[in-house]
């Protein structure tokens, strides 16, 4: 677990913003965070025990939404290269499965937000 570092965020603090380079995967250990659209509207909450930034592991790119701490929050954070290496060391098949799930999620989001 030496590739992980603990980061703390105060309620209202942005963890990442729309358009930022996607370079890390976050595991939310305490608190909750919310996804915020480019217009500033919160549209989803991620609770304690969940993760965010999974797309960074596989494809990098830029953040499609901002993430803001809804409450004080503590995350375990790992860089996307380290996370990918860790994932591959467990099973290369997991990478293929995750890529498929991310594609499905992207398609569902495109349909949802095109209406």
Residue ranges and their predicted role:
Residues 1-115:
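Cytosolic regulatory regions built on CNB/CRP/Popeye-like sensor folds
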């Amino acid at each position: 677990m030496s590739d992980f570092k603990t980061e703390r965020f105060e309620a209202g603090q942005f963890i990442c913003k729309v358009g930022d380079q996607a370079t890390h995967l976050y595991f939310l250990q305490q608190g909750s965070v919310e996804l915020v659209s480019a217009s500033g509207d919160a549209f989803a909450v991620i609770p304690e025990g969940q993760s965010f930034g999974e797309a960074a592991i596989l494809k990098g790119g830029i953040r499609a939404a901002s993430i803001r701490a809804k409450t004080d929050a503590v995350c375990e954070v790992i860089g996307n290269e380290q996370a990918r290496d860790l994932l591959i060391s467990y099973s290369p098949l997991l990478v293929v499965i995750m890529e498929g799930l991310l594609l499905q999620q992207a398609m569902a989001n495109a349909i949802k937000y095109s209406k």
